[in-house]
Amino acid sequence: MMKTAVMFILVVVISLTYSSEEQEVARTYCGRHLANILAYVCFGVEKRGGAQYAPYWQETYLRSRKGPGVVDECCFRPCKLEVLKSFFFFFCD
């Protein structure tokens, strides 16, 4: 009986631990915030200034990618970090 109670409590605790893990929330990223999050994804740092990499990113994007852009995917509608990471090879060198 005692072993059953301990096992039950253990299962409940483990279940609560896994269910309480933070789920990534989709967010919108526009303007400077989009530039900052792209810099973070690319370089692992937060940018202090404006969009200093934006001209390079825009030029690379126009040459390399067909279809919806990062603004379409993450500014006009919410996106998750995984979507931003899918643009990694187009914005990060």
UniProtKB/Swiss-Prot annotation:
GO-annotated biological processes: cell population proliferation; insulin-like growth factor receptor signaling pathway; negative regulation of apoptotic process; positive regulation of cell population proliferation; positive regulation of phosphatidylinositol 3-kinase/protein kinase B signal transduction
UniProt cross-references to InterPro entries, sorted A to Z: Bombyxin (IPR017097), Bombyxin_B (IPR027285), Insulin-like (IPR016179), Insulin-like_sf (IPR036438), Insulin_family (IPR022352)
One of the Pfam families matching this protein, by short name: Insulin
The entry's keywords: Cleavage on pair of basic residues, Disulfide bond, Hormone, Secreted, Signal
Single GO MF annotation: hormone activity
Residue positions assigned to the propeptide: 49-64
Main localization (coarse): secreted
Gene Ontology annotations for the cellular component aspect, listed alphabetically: extracellular space
Source taxon at top rank: Eukaryota
Key word 4Fe-4S present: no
Subcellular localization: Secreted
Cysteine pairs bridged by disulfides in the record: 30-75, 42-92, 74-79
Ranges that cross the membrane: none
Signal peptide residues on this chain, from the entry's feature table: 1-22
Family recorded in the similarity comment: Belongs to the insulin family.
Subunit and interaction comment: Heterodimer of a B chain and an A chain linked by two disulfide bonds.
Function in brief: Brain peptide responsible for activation of prothoracic glands to produce ecdysone in insects.
Other observations noted: Silk worm has two kinds of PTTH: 4K-PTTH and 22K-PTTH; there are many forms of 4K-PTTH.
Official protein name in the record: Bombyxin B-11
The organism of origin for this protein: Bombyx mori
Gene: BBXB11
